[in-house]
């Protein structure tokens, strides 16, 4: 599911909600990578889980998506802001458009922020309305990626069964929150002894997308789940469908909406991409030696209710004795969620709900 899940470990603060889009970060880094020196490009490859001399031939369909039907909506697109008159290489502009469909917009002052804010709001169907971008005097180039996802559950929750239930927060206090309930449905389910958590897979109407809920056995068990996110292999093992059993359960899941705005610079530096933010590394973007990346920022919003999931990000997821016993699974402690795109194997959204 991708090495970028490690970002969650870098950004994790006990007791604090978090939501990021690995797919959005992946798109931005792949775009930047085509303009980097070999050494910096190799470090980005390591971060993205691309090993050896192999570099995947980018497929435009992976990075520029406007996918609609009566079940799902997925939008992934980019825009590139270039200071008017600044010498950006034409090859980089062309490649960014050909692969990522990144539209190029010239700017002369900070008035461009209103235009970008409207573009983000329209692209995310109004889910993100206040994406402010401040183009300081030393900003020459900005690449903005938008990812929007909306999908209906294969098995929707009955709104009549939603009610207030206690949720135990990380600090041990209880809060009453709106909690959905579904029964008489079989979900892929397992108890993972390594991370001491229950794992449930919820399917959307379009089988391309799924959501995994990882519910620790204890209130602070989320720490152990986060600690396990050392690389993509670990998360792949945790959410491996082949290790799960299709089982009828009674599931209690909070309705929730999270909004997060994070600067990814320190996390990416700690993960080995420090050269990315140094001058002189972006030789494929401009001959100017002083050009560097100031920061990589992402704003994400996710909404989960009885009908399905709506999410967006902007970047600058037995029987015994003949009597059937149905497990009751309650997501009533801090838990992790992951929205996965089965087709690309890259998580769309990943986060932790803390109540």
Swiss-Prot record:
Supply the Pfam families for this chain: Serpin
Molecular-function GO terms, alphabetical? serine-type endopeptidase inhibitor activity
**4Fe-4S in keyword set:** no
According to the record, the segments passing through the membrane are none
Record-level GO cellular component terms: extracellular space
Q: Does this UniProt record's set of keywords contain Transmembrane?
A: no
Keyword field: Protease inhibitor, Serine protease inhibitor
Which InterPro entries does the protein's record reference? Serpin_dom, Serpin_fam, Serpin_sf, Serpin_sf_1, Serpin_sf_2
- Say which domain of life the source belongs to: Viruses
| Family per similarity comment | Belongs to the serpin family. Poxviruses subfamily.
| Protein name according to UniProt | Uncharacterized serpin-like protein FPV010
Q: Which organism is it from?
A: Fowlpox virus (strain NVSL) (FPV)
């Amino acid at each position: 599911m991708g090495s970028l899940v490690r970002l969650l470990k870098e950004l994790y603060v006990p007791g604090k909600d978090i939501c990021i889009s690995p797919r959005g970060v992946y798109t931005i880094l792949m775009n930047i990578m085509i303009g980097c020196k070999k050494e910096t490009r190799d470090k980005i490859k390591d971060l993205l889980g691309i090993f050896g001399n192999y570099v995947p031939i980018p497929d435009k369909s992976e990075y520029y998506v406007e996918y609609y039907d009566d079940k799902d909506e997925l939008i992934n697109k980019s825009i590139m802001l270039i200071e008017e008159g600044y010498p950006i290489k034409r090859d980089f502009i062309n490649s960014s458009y050909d692969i990522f469909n990144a539209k190029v917009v010239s700017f002369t002052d900070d008035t461009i922020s209103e235009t970008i804010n409207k573009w983000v709001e329209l692209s995310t169907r109004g889910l993100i309305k206040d994406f402010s971008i401040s183009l300081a005097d030393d900003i020459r180039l900005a690449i903005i990626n938008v990812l929007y996802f909306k999908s209906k559950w294969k098995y929707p929750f009955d709104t009549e069964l939603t009610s207030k239930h206690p949720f135990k927060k990380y600090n041990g206090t209880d809060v009453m929150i709106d909690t959905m309930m579904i029964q008489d449905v079989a979900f892929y389910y397992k108890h993972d002894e390594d991370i001491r958590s229950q794992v449930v897979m919820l399917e959307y109407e379009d089988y391309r997308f799924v959501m995994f809920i990882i519910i620790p056995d204890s209130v602070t068990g989320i720490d152990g789940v986060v600690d396990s996110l050392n690389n993509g292999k670990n998360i792949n093992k945790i959410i491996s469908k082949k290790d799960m059993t299709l089982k009828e359960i009674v599931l209690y899941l909070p309705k929730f909406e999270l909004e997060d705005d994070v600067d990814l610079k320190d996390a990416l530096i700690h993960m080995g991409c420090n050269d990315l933010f140094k001058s002189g590394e972006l030789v494929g973007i401009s001959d100017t030696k002083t050009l560097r990346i100031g920061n990589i920022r992402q704003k994400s919003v996710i909404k989960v209710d009885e009908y399905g999931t709506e999410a967006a990000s902007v970047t600058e997821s037995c029987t015994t004795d003949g009597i059937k016993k149905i497990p009751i699974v309650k997501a009533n402690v801090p838990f992790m969620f992951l929205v996965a795109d089965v087709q690309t194997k890259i998580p769309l959204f990943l986060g932790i709900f803390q109540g």
